[in-house]
Amino acid sequence: MAIVAVYPGTFDPLTNGHADLVQRSCRLFDRLIVAVAAYPSPSKRPAFTLDERLALAREVLKDMPGVEVEAFDTLLVDFVRARGATVILRGLRAVSDFEHEFQLASMNRQLIEEVETVFLTPAEQHAYISSSLVREVAALGGDVTRFVPPVVARALARRYSGPNRDGDGDGQGG
């Protein structure tokens, strides 16, 4: 039986840390679905639309065997169940991530006990990278090429130059 995993996230934007986890998970799972959240949590203000995040993820991950990129707009466990997955993959950058991730894993186990959450840590050179930090550096004109794949760096440069420097695409500067 094939082992199917789901790696959920906002991926706004997809970073080298995300790509590293996906690449390494290809050795662990027969199929990995990178599940891009259609509706990020209310505390997040995405720089990229869902379609942009999907396109960037698909471009970056296109050569990785067994990897698919899909949007989801439901409860994660419902998406996982519908895809026949038995694993939820989560990344842990630091000890500070653990408490929140542990809570999510515990809740998911209550909702769908036949699915396990597997945590992977990024390679050391990616441990400090987060999408929010990358967005902040890019918005302030910094060089993000060490933190994201080239296609993402170009998209960030376009997003944070000109009239939409605030990144939300409305041109209102805030």
Curated annotation (Swiss-Prot):
ATP binds at T10, F11, H18, G91, L92, R93, E101, H126, A127, Y128, I129, S130, S131, S132. GO terms for molecular function: ATP binding; pantetheine-phosphate adenylyltransferase activity. Its cofactor is Mg(2+). The keyword tRNA processing does not apply. Pathway: Cofactor biosynthesis; coenzyme A biosynthesis; CoA from (R)-pantothenate: step 4/5. It catalyses: (R)-4'-phosphopantetheine + ATP + H(+) = 3'-dephospho-CoA + diphosphate. GO terms for biological process: coenzyme A biosynthetic process. Its EC number is 2.7.7.3. It is found in: Cytoplasm. The record marks H18 as: Transition state stabilizer. Keywords: ATP-binding, Coenzyme A biosynthesis, Cytoplasm, Magnesium, Nucleotide-binding, Nucleotidyltransferase, Transferase. Its main location: cytoplasm. Substrate binds at T10, K44, L76, R90. One of its GO terms (cellular component) is cytoplasm. Homohexamer. HAMAP family: PPAT_bact (MF_00151). Reversibly transfers an adenylyl group from ATP to 4'-phosphopantetheine, yielding dephospho-CoA (dPCoA) and pyrophosphate. Belongs to the bacterial CoaD family. This is Phosphopantetheine adenylyltransferase. It comes from Alkalilimnicola ehrlichii (strain ATCC BAA-1101 / DSM 17681 / MLHE-1). The gene is coaD.
